[in-house]
Structure formats: C-alpha cells, structure tokens
C-alpha cells in the first residue's frame, strides 16, 4: 500500500531578504557584464554542483577552506572558462534572473483566467491575492528555486496549474550575499569518529559463546532492532530492452545475508555528528532518538553506482524495494524523507501488512516508484563531469527512513542514509553503523 510523494507544507529555504525590492526594479541588461553562453553554462553547472545552503558556508574537503555559495559559483566559472566573475556579479546575475522570472509569474497570475482557473469568485480572488503577496515577499533565490517557489505557492484554493513551472534544479535558497554568512557548518566528508565494536547493552556474552537463544544473531550486527530486521534494500533502474527482456541496474543495495554470533558487532557513530544533516523540527532525528528505543537507530553510508546509460526514458522505471522480518504480527508504516542541507524536500509514507512465512512475519515493499525529484537528481548527478563534483553535491544530500508500528507509533527502525559515488568497478557498496549518544 503506497502513498504519493509529498513536499513540506511550508518552505524551508533561505533567510536572505530583498525579494520585494528586487521586483520593483526595472529589468535591464546585466550591468555586471555580459554572460556569454560558456559562462552561462558554467553558471548553471555550478548551481547543480553546489546546492543551496541558506546562510551557511560550504567547506571544501580537499582544501579545508570556507566559501559562500556565490563565491564557489564564481570560482567554478573561473576554473571552467578562464573568465572572472566576482561573487557580487554572480549575485547580480541571480537577481536579474529572479526579476525576469517574477515578471513572468505575475503576468500569469494577473490574467482573469489562468490555465482554465477562474478567479471570478471572491474565494478565488483571495487565493490569487495571496499568491501575489507571496511572490512580493520572496527573495530572488526563492523565486528561481523550483522547490522553494512551489512550497511557498502551495496556497489553499490555488492549484499548481495556476502558476508556471520554474526551470532549474538545486536552485533553491541561494545566499544573496555570501560574505554576510554567519552560520558556519564545519561538516566535511571526513571519516566519522568511530567507537569500538563492543557488544550492545543487554546483549553481552562470554567470549566465544552465543547469547541466550532468545537473542537472534542479527541484533547488533545488521540493520535490526529487537522487533524488526531489514533483510534487503535497493534503489534501481529497470530498462525494457524488448517485449520480454528487462535490464536492471542497482544504484544502491543492501543484500540478504546470514549473520552468525561470531560476526563482529557494528561500529558505533555518535548521532550528534549528523544532527544538522537531517530535519531538526518536531519529528526530526534528534527527537526520535530521544524517544528511542536506542537499538533501532542506524547510519548507512552508500557508495552509489551511477555507471549506467539511460537509453529511453519512456521504457525506464526507477524504483525502490525493501524487505523486513519480525517475530511480531503488526502493521508497519515506512516514512522516507529526502533532505537537502538538513531540510526535508519530499516525503513518502507507505503502509505494509504482515505475511506469515516459516515461523516469522514478512513485510515487502516491492517496486515503489521513485519521485520526480529523485529522478531529476540522478540525471543531474550523471551529467556532472567529475566524481568529486558529484560527491560535493551528495555531501549535503541525505535520506531519513523511519519504520514505525502503525498502531502504537513505536519506532521499529530509523535509518539515516548518506552518500558518495562509487569509485569501484564492482558496483554499489555500503557500510552500516550503529547510532549512539554517549
């Protein structure tokens, strides 16, 4: 039983201001210099490489230096074209694009009938007025951001068709002036601080002897709590070759295995190291961990395999499949949140019922479709020319998966996913950690 992907009800974008002032200025040619096709192409590439970061600065892991996003865009243009654009010129160009886009949007909304949507009634006129006011309060960054714009414009009574699609991707919440940034997030792709692979509390046993028979071998050694075990997880692309032939490519994969008591316990990572990479508001990772149980929280580092050619989109299917096992008969709810810079972008909630098999209860989420955001994300990653550029993007992209008992709301599993691109020819790889707080 699957639900649709949904966006947050309210935008979680940049704090930078000046949107309404930008709308009042006439649209002139970019006074900061001509943006030739090669510069414009590099500018668009840089927007994809360096995702929006609000008031934060970005630390390049290979240099250890802090940059505002506009500084990084200017730096990228210089590296790609040999031509110089300052961060102020980048900021000016963003404002020019935003003013142009705002005029287009306002022109659409000012029509009496927009995409067959009648504003003649008082209720409809109120929705239109709210939309106009919303645009007037948006920053330049939000206007050219597809995600931020659609979130901001998700007003009651105003359908999506009433405003035009905003082109671009990863163009959300651009910092207006990188130099004024104060919220520095010093998170780089350095190895996590690990703790020894010691037995979990409650599972200690003499060396060489298994715990009591009531404690299964997978506890503490796999993605598993005392009530639910993830057997398998995969995100994949299926492409139809002919009527009866399909080619399946695994982007990420956790395969089935048979753990034994002789296997080492999972290494532990302090959950506070990753708090800022996931939502912090109500229902976020911190609150979930405080609620417990402690043995239900895991970090999975994926090295994704993007080495595939997408030949025909019309014959392609992007999906996720997962399997779980439990000693208990219950109804589970699986929430999957896609996050950028710690902010939720989209969420999917699925409900699954148990099937009794061989003395246990099995749960299968089979071929759940990926959302459009994720499909676009994969396409943009694949078009970046270098793996280090892909990893720079992925450094601020995370997924939070929470599996709960639908009836009791107890957390059964909470899995934080972080990503890099696989540098191996052997496909996708992964490593699993326990999340702890000492």
UniProtKB/Swiss-Prot annotation:
InterPro entries documented for this protein: TEA/ATTS_dom (IPR000818), TEA/ATTS_sf (IPR038096), TEC1_TEAD_TF (IPR050937), TEF-3 (IPR027255), TEF_metazoa (IPR016361), YBD (IPR041086)
Signal peptide: none
Pfam families according to UniProt: TEA, YBD
One GO molecular-function entry: RNA polymerase II cis-regulatory region sequence-specific DNA binding
GO biological process: DNA-templated transcription; embryonic organ development; hippo signaling; regulation of transcription by RNA polymerase II
DNA-binding region: 28-104
Disulfide cross-links: none
GO cellular component: nucleus; transcription regulator complex
Function: Transcription factor which plays a key role in the Hippo signaling pathway, a pathway involved in organ size control and tumor suppression by restricting proliferation and promoting apoptosis. The core of this pathway is composed of a kinase cascade wherein MST1/MST2, in complex with its regulatory protein SAV1, phosphorylates and activates LATS1/2 in complex with its regulatory protein MOB1, which in turn phosphorylates and inactivates YAP1 oncoprotein and WWTR1/TAZ. Binds m-cat elements from muscle-specific promoters and differentially activate transcription. Isoform B has probably a transactivation capacity that is lacking in the other isoforms. Isoform D may be defective in DNA binding.
Protein name per its UniProtKB record: Transcriptional enhancer factor TEF-3
Source species of the chain: Gallus gallus (Chicken)
Gene (UniProt): TEAD4
């Amino acid at each position: 039983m699957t639900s649709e992907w949904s966006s947050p009800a309210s935008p979680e974008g940049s704090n930078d201001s000046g949107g309404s002032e930008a709308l009042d200025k006439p649209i002139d040619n970019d006074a900061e210099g001509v943006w030739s096709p090669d510069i414009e192409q590099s500018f668009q590439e840089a927007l994809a490489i360096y995702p929006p970061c609000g008031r934060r600065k970005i630390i390049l892991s290979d240099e250890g230096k802090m940059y505002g996003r506009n500084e990084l865009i200017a730096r990228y243009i210089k590296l790609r074209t040999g031509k110089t654009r300052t961060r102020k010129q980048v900021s000016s160009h963003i404002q020019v694009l935003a003013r142009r886009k705002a005029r287009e949007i306002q022109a659409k909304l000012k029509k009496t009938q927009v995409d067959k949507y009648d504003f003649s009634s008082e209720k409809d006129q109120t929705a239109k007025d709210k939309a106009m006011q919303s645009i007037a309060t948006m920053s330049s960054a939000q206007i050219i951001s597809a995600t931020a714009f659609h979130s901001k414009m998700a007003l009651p009574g105003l359908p999506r068709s009433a405003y035009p699609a905003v082109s671009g991707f990863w163009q959300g919440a651009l910092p207006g002036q990188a130099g004024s940034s104060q919220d520095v997030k010093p998170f780089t792709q350095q190895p996590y601080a690990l703790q020894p692979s010691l037995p979990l509390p409650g599972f200690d046993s003499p060396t060489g002897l298994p715990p009591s028979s009531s404690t299964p071998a997978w506890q503490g050694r796999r993605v598993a709590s005392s009530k639910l075990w993830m057997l398998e997880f995969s995100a994949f692309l299926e492409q139809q070759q002919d009527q009866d032939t399909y080619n399946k490519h695994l982007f990420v994969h956790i395969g089935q295995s048979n753990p034994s008591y002789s296997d080492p316990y999972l290494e532990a990572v302090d959950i506070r190291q990753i708090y800022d990479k996931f939502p912090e508001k109500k229902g976020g990772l911190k609150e979930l961990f405080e609620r417990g149980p402690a043995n239900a929280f895991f970090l999975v580092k994926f090295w994704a395999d993007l080495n595939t050619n997408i030949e025909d989109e019309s014959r392609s299917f992007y999906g996720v499949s997962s399997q779980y096992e439990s000693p208990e008969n219950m109804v589970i709810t699986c929430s999957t949140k896609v996050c950028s810079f710690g902010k939720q972008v989209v969420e999917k909630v699925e409900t699954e019922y148990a099937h009794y098999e061989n003395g246990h209860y099995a749960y299968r989420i089979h071929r759940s479709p990926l959302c459009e955001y994720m499909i676009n994300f994969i396409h943009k990653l694949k078009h970046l020319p270098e793996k280090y550029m892909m990893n720079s993007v992925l450094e601020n992209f995370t997924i939070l998966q929470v599996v709960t008992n639908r009836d009791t709301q107890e957390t059964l599993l909470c899995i934080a996913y972080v990503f890099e691109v696989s540098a191996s020819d052997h496909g996708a790889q992964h490593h699993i950690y326990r999340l702890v707080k000492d």
